[in-house]
A protein has these predicted regions:
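Helix-start/N-cap signature of alpha-helical segments
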Residues: 4, 8, 40, 105-106, ...
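Short acidic alpha-helical/loop segments enriched in Asp/Glu that coordinate divalent cations
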Residues: 26-44, 53-72
Length: 146
């Protein structure tokens, strides 16, 4: 977050509450309830990327790089950031957490972040499996000490 009194928790709580409510209704109804995960998954996936970038910045891991002409600053791709998180030997991400995040967010797996950001999703992508993957990823990220 840019300088403000808000925390990530303030921003994550509303879509997290929405996601948990939908999961509970879906599971309790034994999948008879037509859960609507669209807003929660979209929002939390983008917040997940923001949290990862914030953790990197707080650990002095650069989140931007220059283009090949050294003219423009570009945000590093998440897979590149994931590689750099453990370069200093601090093991910021455990191998399990790293694998989970790369599977959920990058081309190495579901590429959920890119697909959402660029509108490449279908309604069928907003399902219980993806909801739980995003929730699990958030829980893993929240355990990182900065």
């Amino acid at each position: 977050l840019r300088e403000s009194k808000e925390s990530w928790l303030d921003i994550i709580t509303p879509p997290l509450r929405l996601l948990c409510n939908e999961i509970i209704k879906d599971v309790v109804s034994q999948h008879q309830y037509k859960a609507d995960y669209v807003c929660a998954i979209d929002s939390l996936t983008m917040k997940l990327e923001g949290c990862i970038r914030e953790i990197c910045r707080r650990r002095s891991i650069p989140t931007v790089t220059e283009d090949k002409h050294n003219e423009i600053l570009l945000e590093k791709l998440l897979d590149k950031l994931g590689e750099e998180c453990n370069l200093d030997g601090s093991l910021l991400l455990t191998p399990c957490t790293h694998k989970l995040l790369m599977t959920v967010l990058t081309k190495q797996g579901y590429n959920l972040r890119n697909n959402i950001a660029h509108g490449f999703t279908n309604l069928s992508d907003y399902n219980l499996q993806n909801a739980i993957m995003v929730l699990h990823s958030l829980l893993k990220i929240s355990a990182i000490k900065v």
